[in-house]
C-alpha cells in the first residue's frame, strides 16, 4: 500500500480541525451571506434564500463591509503612508519625504489599476470577515510582474498557525476541469495520474477533479542556493486529491502570499469570530418572527372563511364580482373567521430584533 503524501496528512488534520466550525458557518451563510456554502453542495444558479424572511442581517453585513472598505481602503483617498524604519520623523528630511510620497503614489496607482483586482478582492474579504470572522486573499504577480490579487473565500481555506499565533500554513481546496488543469499544470503533470491520463485520451476535458494547494514554511530552504527557483522560504505544492494523488506542481514564494485576517479571536482558536456570530440568535429569531407575522397578516387581509354546511355542494366564487347563491329564507352566509391576532405587536417585536442586529453590525 503506497504511503500517503505527508502534506496531505497535514491537510487532513487541518480539515478535521475546521469541521467544528462548518455547521456554524453554514447557518450564518444561509441567513447572512447566501452565496457561501460549507456543508451543502448546491448547483450553480440555484435559489439560496429560502430561509430568509427578513433580510436585515444580509443588508447589515453588506453595509458594514462597504463601510470598512470606504474607511480603510478608499480608492479616492491616499489611505496609507510610508515610513523608513528607525527614522522618527522623515519630515525633517525633505528629499526623503518627497521620495516616500512618490513611491506611495506609485503604489496607489497599482492598487487602483483594474488589472490588479484589488478593490473587488478586498470587498469579498470584508464580506467574509464581517459574516464569519475570517477573511483571506492571495497576492501574486502576473506575467508582467504586476501585483495581482485574488479572492480566496472561506469555504476553500484551511489555515494553521505558528507558535506566535500567526497564520503560516494555508491549504486551498478547489476544483478544476481537465481543460483548466492542463492549462495550469501541463500535459506531463496530468499524465502522472492514470485516471486523468485515461480521460485525456478519451478527450474528456469537462470532467472536474478536486485539488489541494499547500503553502507552508519550507524546512529545506537554503539561502545560499538562490539560483534554484524552487528553493524559497515558502513552498507551494498542488496535489490531485483523488485516486493516486500525484503532485502536480512544486514551487515557492519569497514571502507568505496569503493575507489572512480575523475579526476577533478567542484564545486557542484558529479561526475568527465576527459580528454575525455575536448576534446569530437574534438573526434566527427574526426569521421565525417574520414568518409568523406574515402568516398573521395574511389571516387579517385574507382571512379563513366560515361556510354554511351545504356550501360544499355549491361552488364558492371568491374572485371580484363573483356570484354566490344562498337558500331563500335562511340567514346563512359566508363569513370570515376573525382571529384577533395582534400583528402590530409582532411588528414591534421585529423592530426590536432588527435594531439589535443593526447595532451588532455597527449601523
Per-range role (PLM):
Residues 51-53, 106-112, 184-185, 205-209, ...:
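N-terminal start-of-chain detector that recognizes signal peptides
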Residues 138-144, 215-224, 239-244:
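Short, flexible beta-strand-to-coil junctions
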Residues 1-206:
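Extended, helix-rich architectural segments
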Residues 107, 137, 157, 214, ...:
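Generic structural hydrophobic/aromatic packing signal, biased to beta-strands
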Residues 206-213, 217-218:
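Membrane-proximal cytosolic interface modules of multi-pass membrane proteins
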Residues 141-144, 162-165, 220-231, 328:
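Short, ordered beta-strand-loop transition motifs
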Residues 227, 231-363:
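Extended, charged amphipathic alpha-helical segments
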Amino acid at each position: 500500500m503506497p504511503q500517503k503524501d505527508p502534506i496531505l496528512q497535514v491537510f487532513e488534520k487541518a480539515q478535521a480541525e475546521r469541521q467544528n466550525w462548518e455547521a456554524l458557518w453554514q447557518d450564518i451563510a444561509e441567513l447572512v451571506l447566501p452565496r457561501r456554502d460549507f456543508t451543502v453542495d448546491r448547483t450553480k444558479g440555484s435559489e439560496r434564500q429560502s430561509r430568509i424572511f427578513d433580510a436585515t442581517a444580509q443588508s447589515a453585513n453588506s453595509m458594514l463591509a462597504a463601510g470598512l472598505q470606504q474607511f480603510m481602503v478608499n480608492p479616492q483617498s491616499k489611505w496609507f503612508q510610508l515610513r523608513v524604519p528607525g527614522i522618527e520623523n522623515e519630515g525633517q528630511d525633505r528629499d526623503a519625504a518627497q521620495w516616500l510620497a512618490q513611491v506611495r503614489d506609485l503604489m496607489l496607482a497599482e492598487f487602483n489599476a483594474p488589472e490588479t483586482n484589488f478593490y473587488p478582492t478586498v470587498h469579498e474579504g470584508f464580506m467574509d470577515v464581517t459574516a464569519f470572522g475570517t477573511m483571506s486573499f492571495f497576492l501574486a504577480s502576473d506575467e508582467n510582474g504586476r501585483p495581482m490579487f485574488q479572492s480566496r473565500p472561506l469555504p476553500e481555506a484551511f489555515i494553521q498557525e505558528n507558535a506566535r499565533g500567526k497564520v503560516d500554513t494555508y491549504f486551498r481546496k478547489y476544483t478544476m476541469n481537465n481543460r483548466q488543469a492542463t492549462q495550469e499544470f501541463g500535459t506531463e503533470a496530468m499524465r502522472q495520474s492514470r485516471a486523468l491520463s485515461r480521460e485525456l485520451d478519451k478527450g474528456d476535458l469537462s470532467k472536474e477533479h478536486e485539488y489541494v494547494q499547500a503553502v507552508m514554511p519550507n524546512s529545506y530552504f537554503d539561502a545560499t542556493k538562490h539560483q534554484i527557483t524552487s528553493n524559497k522560504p515558502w513552498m507551494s505544492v498542488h496535489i490531485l486529491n483523488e485516486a493516486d494523488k500525484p503532485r502536480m506542481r512544486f514551487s515557492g514564494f519569497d514571502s507568505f502570499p496569503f493575507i489572512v485576517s480575523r475579526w476577533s479571536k478567542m484564545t486557542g482558536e484558529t479561526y475568527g469570530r465576527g459580528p454575525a456570530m455575536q448576534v446569530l440568535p437574534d438573526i434566527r429569531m427574526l426569521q421565525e418572527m417574520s414568518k409568523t407575522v406574515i402568516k398573521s397578516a395574511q389571516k387579517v387581509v385574507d382571512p379563513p372563511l366560515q361556510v354554511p354546511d351545504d356550501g360544499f355542494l355549491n361552488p364558492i366564487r371568491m374572485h371580484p364580482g363573483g356570484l354566490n347563491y344562498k337558500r331563500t329564507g335562511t340567514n346563512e352566509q359566508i363569513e370570515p373567521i376573525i382571529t384577533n391576532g395582534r400583528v402590530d405587536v409582532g411588528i414591534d417585536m421585529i423592530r426590536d430584533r432588527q435594531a439589535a442586529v443593526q447595532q451588532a453590525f455597527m449601523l
